[in-house]
């Protein structure tokens, strides 16, 4: 999907806010802890290359989801460590070794496949993934991990790190969190050959469980100024939301009582009113179910009426505003604000998803 530069819909990304958010977390966690910036999914929709370059002086490395995301950073000149958090199958290892990308290994089956596909792992840096209770990828026993580490080292790999991921670090009830933490600690303590880096802290753990940090953290959503819990838990320090989303009115008209708006005729005017059309829709990540939510025009909340279309939405206006009038979908407009979390709550989802759904059809302005 190409970016649409010839329409007024844009996302503005404040890189300075991202840098300050990361600095706030770094002040909150123990000294000497390594920081990895999580820039997967195009830095949660903010632009992985631009964010990575902005954070280059502040962080020790980056986390991505897959090899393609890692290669994008390498091609952009990012030379610090890049860890792939997902599983890279052994047939892609040559490229990972050549471009000095650190991979996650999560099973003995992977090791067996590597012996067949690419038995010489010299130059490969590895982090071992532990499933402490998330139920996704990872090993579950000390014996498995010991065997995996020994096998990887025998093939020439540098087993630099070991890590896990918490399922409920952003919830008030820490029962599950503590179960996972104790599982991970016990496993680490039982290893014959412990890797140099041990990390379990995502954004939520770094904020609300900073006393449980090992020697590295992975900062994702908090870097972009959002509360990992949505609004369930209070933040110990302020954050700046880094992305705003805006457009403009491209059509304004008066409709009469009884007129309908949008697909399915789901909105019927009860009286004569002004309506405005805004060029953003579900193809941009502004989902179809946003009817009834509001955007900001001239410091006023204006309701979205009718279903959101692929490329457009329609709002009720208090008067006939001129074409080109600014419309704020995320961010501030004359002392009023719409946050990403507000949108997530309306959609019954999480703020992460709202950002990640913003398509690359929307240009990012830095």
Curated annotation (Swiss-Prot):
Keywords of this entry: Isomerase, Pyridoxal phosphate
GO function term, MF aspect, one: pyridoxal phosphate binding
Cofactor needs: pyridoxal 5'-phosphate
Entry-linked Pfam families: Ala_racemase_C, Ala_racemase_N
EC top class, as a word: isomerase
Catalytic activity: L-alanine = D-alanine
Disulphide-bridged cysteine pairs: none
Keyword Glycosyltransferase: no
InterPro entries: Ala_racemase, Ala_racemase/Decarboxylase_C, Ala_racemase_C, Ala_racemase_N, Ala_racemase_pyridoxalP-BS, PLP-binding_barrel
Residue list for modification N6-(pyridoxal phosphate)lysine: 40
Annotated catalytic residues: 40, 263
EC number assigned by the record: 5.1.1.1
GO CC field: cytosol
Family listed: Belongs to the alanine racemase family.
Protein's recorded name: Alanine racemase
Source organism phylogeny: Bacteria, Bacillati, Bacillota, Bacilli, Lactobacillales
């Amino acid at each position: 999907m190409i970016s649409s530069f010839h329409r007024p819909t844009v996302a503005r990304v404040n890189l300075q806010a991202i840098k300050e958010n990361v600095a706030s977390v770094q002040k909150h966690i123990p000294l000497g802890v390594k920081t990895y910036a999580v820039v997967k999914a195009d830095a949660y929709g903010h632009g992985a290359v631009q964010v990575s370059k902005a954070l280059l002086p502040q962080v020790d490395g980056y986390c991505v989801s897959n090899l393609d995301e890692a290669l994008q950073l390498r091609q952009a000149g990012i030379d610090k460590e890049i860890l792939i958090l997902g599983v890279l199958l052994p047939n892609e290892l040559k490229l990972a070794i050549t471009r000095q990308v650190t991979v996650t290994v999560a099973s003995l089956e992977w090791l067996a496949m590597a012996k067949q596909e690419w038995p010489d792992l010299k130059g490969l840096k590895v982090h071992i993934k532990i499933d402490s209770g998330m139920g996704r990828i990872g090993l579950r026993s000390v014996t498995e991990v010991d065997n995996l580490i020994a096998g990887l080292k025998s093939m020439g790999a540098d087993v630099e790190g070991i890590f896990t991921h918490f399922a409920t670090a952003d919830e008030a009830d820490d029962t599950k969190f503590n179960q996972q933490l104790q599982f991970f600690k016990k496993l680490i303590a039982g290893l014959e050959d412990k890797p140099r880096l041990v990390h379990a802290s995502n954004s939520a753990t770094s904020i609300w469980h900073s006393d449980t940090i090992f020697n590295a953290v992975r900062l994702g959503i908090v870097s972009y100024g959002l509360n990992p819990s949505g609004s369930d838990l209070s933040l110990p320090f302020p954050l700046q939301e880094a992305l705003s989303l805006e457009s403009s009115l491209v059509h304004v008209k008066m409709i009469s009582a009884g007129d309908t708006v949008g697909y399915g005729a789901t909105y019927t005017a009860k009286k004569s009113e002004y309506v405005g059309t805004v060029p953003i829709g579900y193809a941009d990540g502004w989902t179809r179910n946003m009817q009834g939510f509001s955007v900001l025009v001239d410091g006023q909340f204006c309701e979205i009426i009718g279903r959101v279309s692929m490329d457009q939405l329609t709002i009720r206006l208090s008067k006939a505003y001129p074409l080109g009038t600014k419309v704020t979908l995320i961010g501030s407009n004359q002392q009023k604000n719409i946050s990403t979390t507000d949108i997530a709550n309306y959609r019954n989802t999480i703020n992460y998803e709202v950002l990640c759904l913003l398509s690359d059809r929307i240009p990012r302005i830095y």
